[in-house]
């Protein structure tokens, strides 16, 4: 039988050789339950119903500092400066971080690399609860991870956030 012949042969009603039945799953053993059809998350993976922001887990994702007002408030915060970064912070109920890397640092790929490094450094430090702003200087593009790490710690010590 030719492929042309298959396409032109009349189909029996309700029968399509390419589609299986609605409840039919060839990979599922007979009698096994179908997965739940309520949304994209499985029951064990549903989001918790807890209210309010959760503090970042040690080694977890950092919360971002957002909104112009939050950045304006940080102008009155405590400051510290290193060779590659300057930091400002204010005490807060939770740790939130804003990272600023200007176009003077370089093109987008370089700026994003500096931001990723700074985010990882701050994640590793397990900082106290504060709103923290980290501004990278153009020289930060030449610093390797270890130099940047030492400089961030130095700036945070000068500002009084860490000992």
Swiss-Prot record:
<dbReference type="InterPro" id="IPR000100">
    <property type="entry name" value="RNase_P"/>
</dbReference>
<keyword id="KW-0378">Hydrolase</keyword>
<dbReference type="GO" id="GO:0000049">
    <property type="term" value="F:tRNA binding"/>
</dbReference>
<comment type="subunit">
    <text>Consists of a catalytic RNA component (M1 or rnpB) and a protein subunit.</text>
</comment>
<feature type="region of interest" description="Disordered">
    <location>
        <begin position="1"/>
        <end position="68"/>
    </location>
</feature>
<comment type="similarity">
    <text>Belongs to the RnpA family.</text>
</comment>
<dbReference type="GO" id="GO:0030677">
    <property type="term" value="C:ribonuclease P complex"/>
</dbReference>
<keyword id="KW-0540">Nuclease</keyword>
<keyword id="KW-0255">Endonuclease</keyword>
<keyword id="KW-0694">RNA-binding</keyword>
<feature type="compositionally biased region" description="Polar residues">
    <location>
        <begin position="8"/>
        <end position="19"/>
    </location>
</feature>
<protein>
    <recommendedName>
        <fullName>Ribonuclease P protein component</fullName>
        <ecNumber>3.1.26.5</ecNumber>
    </recommendedName>
</protein>
<dbReference type="GO" id="GO:0001682">
    <property type="term" value="P:tRNA 5'-leader removal"/>
</dbReference>
<dbReference type="Pfam" id="PF00825">
    <property type="entry name" value="Ribonuclease_P"/>
</dbReference>
<dbReference type="GO" id="GO:0004526">
    <property type="term" value="F:ribonuclease P activity"/>
</dbReference>
<comment type="function">
    <text>RNaseP catalyzes the removal of the 5'-leader sequence from pre-tRNA to produce the mature 5'-terminus. It can also cleave other RNA substrates such as 4.5S RNA. The protein component plays an auxiliary but essential role in vivo by binding to the 5'-leader sequence and broadening the substrate specificity of the ribozyme.</text>
</comment>
<dbReference type="GO" id="GO:0042781">
    <property type="term" value="F:3'-tRNA processing endoribonuclease activity"/>
</dbReference>
<dbReference type="InterPro" id="IPR014721">
    <property type="entry name" value="Ribsml_uS5_D2-typ_fold_subgr"/>
</dbReference>
<dbReference type="InterPro" id="IPR020568">
    <property type="entry name" value="Ribosomal_Su5_D2-typ_SF"/>
</dbReference>
<dbReference type="InterPro" id="IPR020539">
    <property type="entry name" value="RNase_P_CS"/>
</dbReference>
<keyword id="KW-0819">tRNA processing</keyword>
């Amino acid at each position: 039988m030719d492929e042309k012949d298959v396409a032109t042969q009349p189909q029996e009603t309700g029968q399509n050789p390419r589609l299986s039945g609605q409840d039919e799953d060839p990979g599922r053993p007979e009698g096994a339950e179908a997965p739940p059809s309520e949304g994209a998350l499985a029951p064990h993976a549903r989001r918790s119903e807890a209210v309010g922001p959760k503090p970042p887990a040690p080694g977890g994702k950092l919360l971002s500092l957002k909104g112009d007002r939050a950045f304006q408030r940080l102008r009155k915060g405590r400051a510290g400066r290193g060779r590659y970064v300057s930091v400002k912070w204010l005490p807060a109920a939770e740790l939130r971080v804003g990272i600023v890397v200007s176009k003077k640092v370089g093109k987008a790929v370089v700026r994003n690399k500096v931001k990723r490094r700074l985010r990882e450094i701050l994640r590793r430090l397990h900082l106290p609860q504060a709103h923290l702003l980290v501004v990278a200087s153009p020289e930060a593009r030449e610093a390797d991870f270890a130099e940047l790490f030492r400089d961030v710690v130095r700036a945070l010590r000068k500002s009084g956030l860490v000992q």
